Amino acid sequence: MALLATLLLSAALGALLSFALLAAAVASDYWYILEVADAGGLGGVQLFSHSGLWRTCEGQNSCVPLIDPFASAGLEVSPSVQHLLSLHRTVMVVLPLSLVLIVCGWVCGLLSSLSQSVPLLLATGCYFLLGGALTLAGLSIYISYSHLAFVEAARTYGVTHVQNVHISFGWSLALAWASCASEVLSGALLLAAARLLSLSQRPGVPHSVIL
């Protein structure tokens, strides 16, 4: 049963890695990076800012909180801004919720591993796959939100004011993508472990099949 133990251990480590990566991503401020190039075309950078889920920072310091999308729900704003606020609210709920689900899944995975229960392993594997899908949905919504926010800024201030602006996604988003991949991998490993354990419990299965 060495292979089964390896699968279970790998799944547990993958879940822990997924939690650590997503926690670091959610807490950091390098999701969205904005640079304003020199208007004279010299290639210099006049302004550099980076944003996270909770605040935006100019340079290395001077961070200010982002507008609370929940407190802003009743404001009289345009439909496009209301849509942006709703996307921001969704991201701020989905990604922290994914963290909680990873912890719950890790506990369920530990219990199913100790009990050597095929149904529990299957359920936990599917749980992690669904959790990975939720994280993926949150990341996709954030990317859409960032794009629409830039479009709204261009519409509000004029295209000429944003033509020297360069935007990109930072390492925080990369950590979140890695967390999503690790979570899905953990789910796949648990499903493989459930399959292996199911085969080993069948009567008449040669011992070499389960080693």
From Swiss-Prot:
Superkingdom of this protein's organism: Eukaryota
Keyword terms of this UniProt record: Endoplasmic reticulum, Glycoprotein, Membrane, Signal, Transmembrane, Transmembrane helix
Main location: membrane
Annotated localization: Membrane; Endoplasmic reticulum
GO annotations of cellular component type: apical plasma membrane; cytoplasm; endoplasmic reticulum
Database matches in Pfam families: Claudin_2
TM regions (residue ranges): 91-111, 118-138, 173-193
Membrane topology per record: Multi-pass membrane protein
PTM comment text: N-glycosylated.
Leader sequence residues: 1-28
Family, as annotated: Belongs to the PMP-22/EMP/MP20 family.
PANTHER family per the UniProt record, alphabetical: TRANSMEMBRANE PROTEIN 114/235 FAMILY MEMBER, TRANSMEMBRANE PROTEIN 235
Protein name: Transmembrane protein 235
Gene symbol of the encoding locus: Tmem235
